[in-house]
C-alpha cells in the first residue's frame, strides 16, 4: 500500500510541478500538503525530476508560518533528503533552506559545498539587493487597514499622490456599461424607498420557501384585515392566536402560513434528494416482493418436479428452479491469468522520469509463447502474454535491446539463475537525470548477442529455472563462477530498457542500462583446495582490472556508457576492445587450446567508470595454500596449475568505498623478456623451469604480435592460447594500421606497454618475478611494472592531441584513480612517453573534483596547501601550456647504518612526532637513520657514493604527517595480503618514465637527475585534520588529496641497494649493470595506505628504465631482474598493531562519503521501524552504508551488531498455539567484507506476566 501511495504522490507532484513553462513555483500546492503527504514526499523524493524537486522546495516558502511550525519535523526530513541529492542545484537549495523550518530564515553560511560556494554567494548577494531595493516601500502596521482616510493620514502622514503616467482619450466599453448599471441600481433603490413598508412580521421574511409550495407568501394581502380578527364572537385568548391568524380555507392570497417543525420546507436540491430516496426504497420493496414470489413459485415447481420425475437431470432442475445454469470454471484450463505482480513489486520506487516507458519496457520483456502453455504452467506467476508490439509500438525504442527474462524463482534457485540473468538485471532505481550505472557480464555458456530477441524461455517445472542456464559448477571441472546478483530490494522489472531518454544504440556498441550489482561468489576462494588435481586447477584471471587500466572508452563521464565486446580471436581485430571481465574458463588441459578462443570472443562487458566490479586477490593464507600444492605436473603446465592467489569477489558495498581502502594486488603474471629467459631461470626458480621459460619466449612473441594487431582500439588479449601461463599486455594506442603484425612489431620496437601480471609460481618458493615483455627487435631495457587499477573508476591510455603526437595521456575521470604508467627507455625526445593528467577544459588548471561533497573542504585546503609557495617546492616545467603543474618535492631518506659525511643529527620520536613536522631548512640534504631515533642530514651530492644502503626498510606511522619511524631488523615492509576476510581496493601512484626526482603529473625530461641513485616513492595517508590550518610540509613531501579520500603524502627516497632484508632489491647482475651505467636509475614505488585501523595492505612495484636518451647509447641498457622477497607475515604484526593503536587514538578524519538513493531508501525503511537505535548508532550505520570501513568500535572479529528495535508479537508455535514473543531486530555490520544484514531474535515472554 505504501508503494501505491508513494507512486500516487510522485505522480501528483509531477502533474502539478512537472510543466516546464514556469521555472519557479508559487504556493499552489501548499493548500494540499499535510503531514502524511510530506512523509510520502520524503519517501519518493529521490525519484522525482530535478525541476519538480526545485519547485517543491521553493513552494515550502509559501507555507503559512503556523503550518511550518506544525510540520517542522516533516519539512526538515524532506530538506535533509534533498541535501543528499546528487543534483547540485537541489542539494544547494536544500542547504540554503536548511534553517527555514526552524528560524523562518535562509541559511546564508555554506561551508560544505566548495565548488558551488561562488554560485551560492552570488545568489545571496542578488537576494540582498532585491531586499534592499524593495525595503524602502515601507510596510504599514497591521491596524492601518481598519482606519478611515482621515485617521490614516493622522497616523502615517500625507501619502504622495500616485504619479499619473497617461490619460485615456476614450473610456472603454466596460466603463460605460458600469456607469449604466450604477444608474439603474440607484433608480431602483429610490423607487423602493417610495413604496410603503410591509405589515408582515420581520421574522417571516427570511423564511425559506419550498419551491413546490403553492401557498402565496407575498407579504401584503389583497384585502387588508381592518376588522381585527374578523369575528367579534371569538375570544381573544393568547393561546388561540395562531389559529386565528391562519388564512381561511377559501382564500388563496393570505399573507402568512404557520407550519410545524417537521414540515419545515426544504431547499429544492434537498427535496429532490429526499424524493429520489423514497423512490429507491419503493423500488427495493417491489423487487423483494417479486423475488419472494418467484422463490415461492420455484420451490413449489421444484418440489412438484421432484415428486413427478425423480430422474430429471440436475441441469433441468436448475433450469426449472431459476433458469440459471451453473457454469463450471473449465475455461481456466486453457486461459492463463496475466499477472504483473513480480514485475511491479517495486515499480513505484523506480524512476518516474518516464513512468510509462519503464512500465512498457518491463512488460515487453515478459513475453512468452502463449501457444505453448504446457511448459509455462509451473512458473506462471509472472506475465507472459503481453505481446512484443508493446515495445515495438513505441517510436525510437531500439528493438535490439529486448532480452530474455527469467521467471522469478526462489532464492536458492535465483542464485544459480543469475549467470543467465546478469546481463538483463535492469533497475530504474536511480535519480532520473543521471544515466544509470551499467554492468553487463555474460558467462561463457550463455552467448546471447544483443541483437537476438529470445521469444521462448524453456523452464523445467520441477526446478523452476531456465533450462539454458549453466549447471552449478563442480569443484574439479569448473572454477568458481562469478554470479552477479542484484540486491533483493531491486529485483523488479528485469528486462531490457526501452527508455528513450537514456538508450543509445550504435553499430558496434549497444548500451544496456544496468543497476549496480552485488557480486557474490558461488564458491568462495577456498574452493580451490589443495586436494584438486594439478591438471585441472586453473588460475582465474579476470581481464576486468586490465580493462579498467587500458580501455580507452571506459573512463567517459558518468552520463555516457559504452559497451565493449572482445575481439574474436584474430579475425575481428578491428572491433577489438576489452574482453569480458567476469567470465571464468573451465579449463581442462586436453581441450584448453581449442576452447579458449571461442569462449572469450563472445562475452561483452559493459561497465561505467563509477561502477566497480573488482576481483581482489586472496589473503596470504590462500597464497600459502597455493604454495603448498605439489608441483608434480610437467613443466609445461606448472605455471597454470598452481594458482598463486585464489580470486574472490568484492561486494558492492565495499566497492563503493574504493577511495577509502588500501591497495590490493589484483592480478599478477610472470611475463619475461625473450632475451633474459635463461638468465632469469637461474635467478628466480629451479633449473627445471628453464625449459618452460624458453617456451614462454615464443609464446610471448606470438602474444605480442597479436596484441599489436589490436592496438588501434587498445585491446587486451583475453588469454594466451597456451595452457601454461596467463598473460595480458596492454599496449599504448598507435596510429598505424593493424594488418601486418610482423612489420609493425619491427617498426615499433620501443612500444611502451602497460602490463598486468597474473603472478604464478612455478615452484613453492617466495620469489616472484615482475617483468614486462618488450619486442625482440629492440635492444633496450624492458619495463618492469606491477599494474594496479583503482576500483572506483578505470584508467585508460589514449593519444593526446594532434599537436603533441609524442605524448600519450592517461585520461582520469572525476574520481581520478592513480596509475603506474611506465614506458620503455626513452631513446629520443620525440618518442612516446606516458604521462598522466586530468581531463579538463582548455586554459584551466588541473582540478580534481571530489566524488562526494563532504570531502570538498578538505580538498580545497589540500589544493591551497599544494599551491602555497613553500621554499622547498620544486616547480617542474610543464609541457602542456594549458595545464597547471603539480608541485612536487623530493626527500631522499636512506635509513642505514652510520655512513659517510654526517652533517648534523635530528632526534625524532615517533610518538612526539604525532602532531609535529620535521622541517628541513636546508634544500640539498636527506635524512639518514644512524641508530635509535637519531637521524642524520646528508647532502644529496654524497648519496651517489654511499654503498652501504642495504638492510634498511622504511615505515611510516599513520599518527602524524611525516613522522619518521626507526626501523628494526624484523620490521621489513612486505608485499603482503593479510587477514583473510579483508579485501581492500588498490591505490596507484603516478611516476615518470625516467628515474627523475619528481613525482609529477606531466614531465618530458626530468629537470635534475641524481646520478647513480635508486629512488623510492612512498605515499602515506595524512591522518591529522587538514582543516585545522595549512601544515608546513618538509622538503620532499607532497600532499596529494584525492576525492573521497584522505590526504596522502608522497615522498621520494633513496632506495636500498643490496638484497639483505629489503622490500625490493635488484640482483647482483643488475647491481653490476647499475655501476656500469651511471645514468641508469631504478624507481621503486612503495604504497602504504592504511585508512582503517585493522586493514593494512602494502603494494610494491618496481620499474627499471635505462636512461638511453641521456646516454646516447641505445644498446647500453641491460635488462634487469627485480626480485620481490615475500617474508613471513608474522614479522609485520607488531608494527601493524602499533599503527592501529596510534590511529585509534587520534581525532576522527572527515571522509568524503556519499549514499546512493537505494541506500537512502533502505536506511529510511530500517530506521522507520527502529525504536531502540540511538543517534550515534544511526550515524555509524549510515557511515557504513556510505562506505566507511574504519570500525569505530574495534573488536576481534571486526564485526558490529547493533540493536535496531524490539516489539512484542504473537508468534504461531509448532503445537498450534500462539505465544507472546519479544522480537528484537538487529543489524550486523561486517567491516571485513563490507556487507550488512538485518536479522531478528525471538525471545519467549513470560506468559503469566504478559496476561
From Swiss-Prot:
What does a knockout show?
A: Loss of zygotic expression results in morphologically normal embryos that hatch as 1st instar larvae. These larvae survive for several days but do not increase in size. Loss of maternal expression causes arrest prior to the cellular blastoderm stage and embryos display abnormal nuclear morphology. Those that escape this early arrest proceed through the blastoderm stage and gastrulate normally, but then almost always arrest during germband retraction with head defects and incomplete dorsal closure.
Indicate where this protein resides in the cell: Nucleus; Chromosome
The UniProt keywords, alphabetically, are: Chromosome, Developmental protein, Nucleus, Repressor, Transcription, Transcription regulation
Q: A Gene Ontology molecular-function term?
A: RNA binding
Q: Name one Pfam family in it.
A: NELF-A_N
Q: Write out the ranges of the annotated region (Disordered).
A: 185-256, 269-333, 343-362, 387-430, 484-509, 578-607, 852-872, 1099-1154
Matching entries from InterPro entries are given as: HDAG_dom, NELF-A_domain, NELF-A_N
One annotated Gene Ontology cellular component of this protein: transcription repressor complex
Identify the domain of life: Eukaryota
Q: Which residues form the HDAg domain?
A: 89-254
**Basic and acidic residues compositional bias, start-end:** 277-289
Transcription regulation found in the keyword field: yes
Low complexity compositional bias, start-end: 290-306, 417-426, 493-509, 578-600, 1119-1151
Q: Which GO terms describe its biological process?
A: negative regulation of transcription by RNA polymerase II; negative regulation of transcription elongation by RNA polymerase II
- Biased-composition ranges, Polar residues, are 309-318
The segments labelled NELF-C/D-binding in the record are: 128-191
Region RNAPII-binding, annotated ranges: 192-254
- So what does this one do? Essential component of the NELF complex, a complex that negatively regulates the elongation of transcription by RNA polymerase II. Has an essential role in postembryonic development.
Q: How does it assemble?
A: Component of the NELF complex. Interacts with Clamp.
The record's family statement is:
Belongs to the NELF-A family.
Q: What is this protein called?
A: Negative elongation factor A
Record organism = Drosophila melanogaster
State which gene encodes it.
Nelf-A
